[in-house]
Amino acid sequence: MKTNKKNLGISIGLALAIAAPVASADILFWSTQAKPVQEAQAMRTEVLSDYSEGVDYQPNDGGPWQTRLQAELQAGSGSISVLGALHGDFSALSAEDLIDLDDLGVSSASTTFNDLAKLGTADLQYIPWMQATYIMAANKKALAYLPKGADIDALSYDQLIAWAANVHEATGEPKFGFPAGPKGLKHRFFQGYLYPSFTDGVVRTFASDKAVVAWDTFKELWAHTNPASTNFSFMQEQLLNGDAWIVFDHTSRLADAFNERPDDFVAFPAPAGPEGRGFMPVLAGLAIPRTAADVDAAKDLIAYMLKPETQIATLRATGFFPVVDVELPNDLPASVIATGAAVAKMSASADANPGLLPAGLGSMGGDFNRVFVDSFERIVLGGQDVRTVLNDQKKALSKIMKETGAPCWAPDAPSKGACPVE
């Protein structure tokens, strides 16, 4: 009888355990962003702590992020509710694996970003979340030499060249500064700014006639560029020491200039070419996998993340800028206020033409960058014929694309399979 009583007790215990109400689990926010310990903690304590429900924020590298997501998708169910990742991460997924988010009623202030977030479909597959990018900055002394009628927030490449030429003539020194040093991010300028602005592509249009015009235009700008730019890597240094009055760089590499002498410098959008205002956004978004346990709860969290006050809290936590219209508070660092305004103007401009970060290249990302750096060194520094160099470098680029099988990314037209170098 003892044995029977014991079994009966176990059975009753199991039944009670099954019948007992289970506390709802926190919403799992599975992200590739804000991974450093300090940023992740700030996301939990400063961004998500005011949300009405519990959120389990879990940042991971791209590999583990993708592995768990794919496992849940294959299983047909899972615990991930909200995905946070870069545009390139989402573009590698099938749109069928994400919940359409058009009915959410929130989106970014940038029509361009919202179009990207549709991933080639008719509906939003992710909601733009936050952004970082590269911009222009200038010493306010240079403003007196702007070409007549030029709007610093809507410059063309021709106006930028004329401006640099005016400063050159007035000071007797070439004062445009470019991060062409060993650790400079020059390749991102060519991939995300020059090529989209002049060719409306990067890979397909690499050796096009429009690309020849792009390089010829950059050579004109180089004539008014401080020749020591081949040693420049963080343009904040040249702004502060006066070696350059007009510069291009990543927002983080301009920060010291604005924080140390905020009244001396101005930030503004990159210039536009014949094909629009090319710029390279590091665009992160939020999505919901089709296997999410509670889609409504996930949608509510995404809506919360797009609130202006949440976007500002995210900026403080991560250094990434808002994608919605917000008025930045005065207690932010001077660099954030100055560069944030320029980023917002650039991404929301009517002629914005984003050149996205290269995607799908794996370990050959460095080889891809080298194609553009080699082209710069041969054409601009070495004075070689543009057409000859592009035809030569085209072979190296084509080999990389075929070996990786990487499909095209914006602004190149989509491809089935490896992006062709036309």
Task: Give residue ranges: language-model regions.
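Extracytoplasmic "Venus flytrap"
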Residues: 26-44, 360-364
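Extracytoplasmic/periplasmic substrate-binding proteins
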Residues: 30, 189, 216-297, 420
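Glycine-centered hinge/linker elements that transmit conformational signals in sensory
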Residues: 161-168, 201-232, 258
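Periplasmic-binding protein-like
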Residues: 39, 141-142, 171, 304-327
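Extracytoplasmic "Venus flytrap"/periplasmic binding protein-like
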Residues: 27-28, 45-112, 144-147, 245-246, ...
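Extracytoplasmic/periplasmic solute-binding protein
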Residues: 123-129, 134, 158-203, 210, ...
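Hinge/lid segment of periplasmic solute-binding proteins
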Residues: 86-135, 159-161, 266-268, 422
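Long, aromatic- and glycine/proline-rich binding clefts that accommodate carbohydrate-like moieties
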Residues: 32, 117, 317-378, 406-422
